[in-house]
Design a protein with these regions (language model features):
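Loop/turn-rich, solvent-exposed surfaces of beta-rich toroidal or solenoidal domains
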Residues: 164-247
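Conserved beta-strand positions in repeat-built beta-propeller and related beta-rich domains
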Residues: 35, 42-47, 82-87, 128-133, ...
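WD40 beta-propeller blade core
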Residues: 50-51, 90-92, 140, 190-191
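Blade-loop segments of beta-propeller domains
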Residues: 5-41, 45-48, 56-72
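Short coil/turn segments that connect the beta-strands within blades of beta-propeller domains
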Residues: 37-40, 78-80, 122-124, 177-179, ...
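Short loop/turn segments immediately following beta-strands, especially the blade-tip
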Residues: 2-3, 95-100, 142-152, 193-206
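Repeated scaffold domains used in trafficking and secretory/extracellular systems
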Residues: 21-33, 67-76, 111-118, 163-176, ...
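A short beta-strand motif characteristic of beta-propeller blades
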Residues: 6-23, 58-64, 101-109, 154-163, ...
Length: 283
């Protein structure tokens, strides 16, 4: 709880009865997106896991291994999942099957140092940042072919290339500002404005505008909501015990925790419809 700093919900692979050989996949959580109207959590972990967990009863609905160091994941319009994995530089798609529960990679796109994926429901694009070459970070977009049983990302396009920025970390919608995305990188925090970017029915590749908002280095995650901005600024190699605002003021702390990301529990209308139901697989 952001106000009381108390733990009001938790999940672990042991009590969820994940097989022992796969429990290590869930070491060091690296993403915690509330999805499907905040009834589920989409998570990744540095041990390799991508997973969808139902909040009400802690049920593990789907999970898979997406590589050596995944940093984020996203829900596609048909309920399938896509992940970003940095070690091998992969954007992987998965067929979500809640009967089988355990899944595997369906298709892979190579994208160097991939750290993030965000769906744009207005334009029907998936966005991701990656390293084109050392010291050069770029924003990419993909179309989704919509094949529920064999999901693929197609039509890769470079939307924006930084002249002097590296290490794209978190890409996340800006609450309250339509068409905008946060990006945290090695030297600063930016906002992309996608207003001029057309939808996926065209082949137009209009470049978004990019504004440096905060000259704060190495922010691992950022999100905002009605109660302001929350950032994860590492106090150790990649983690901290709490979250701060844009002024560096501590807002939340869990003693002994190794936090990599923090998300407000609010609906993400940039990526998902206002009414966003999760459909269970049939036997």
């Amino acid at each position: 709880d952001a106000e009381t700093h108390r733990n009001i919900w938790s999940w672990d692979p042991y009590t969820a009865c994940v097989p022992a050989a796969q429990q290590g996949w869930f070491v060091n959580p690296s993403e915690v997106k509330p999805v499907f109207n905040r009834r589920y959590i989409l998570m990744t972990a540095s041990g390799g896991a991508v997973a969808l967990i139902r909040l009400s009863d802690h049920k593990l609905m789907f999970y898979a291994n997406c590589g050596q160091n995944p940093h984020s994941a996203e829900v596609l319009p048909d309920g399938n999942i896509v992940s970003a994995e940095s070690k091998s530089g992969e954007i992987n798609t998965f067929v979500v099957d809640t009967v089988k529960v355990l899944g595997e990679k369906a298709n892979t796109v190579k994208l160097g140092n991939a750290h993030n994926v965000v769906w744009d429901k207005k334009r029907s694009y998936l966005y991701a940042t990656a390293t084109k070459k050392e010291g050069v970070t770029a924003l990419f977009r993909f179309k989704y072919d919509g094949n529920r049983s064999n999901p693929k990302l197609i039509n890769q396009t470079t939307l924006y290339t930084f002249s002097n920025e590296s290490g794209g970390h978190d890409l996340f919608p800006v609450y309250g500002e339509e068409d905008k995305l946060w990006l945290t990188a090695a030297s600063a925090v930016y906002k992309f404005d996608l207003t001029g970017v057309t939808d996926a029915t065209t082949n137009d590749s209009t470049e978004p505008t990019c504004e440096k908002v905060y000259s704060i280095a190495d922010i691992k995650s950022i999100c905002n909501g009605p109660d302001g901005i929350r950032m994860l600024k590492p106090t150790e190699e990649w983690w901290a015990e709490g979250l701060v605002n844009e002024k560096g003021e501590e807002l939340f702390k869990m003693d002994g925790a190794k936090i990599y990301k923090g998300r407000w529990m609010i609906d993400n209308l940039f990526s998902y419809p206002e009414k966003h139901d999760f459909v269970l697989s049939e036997d």
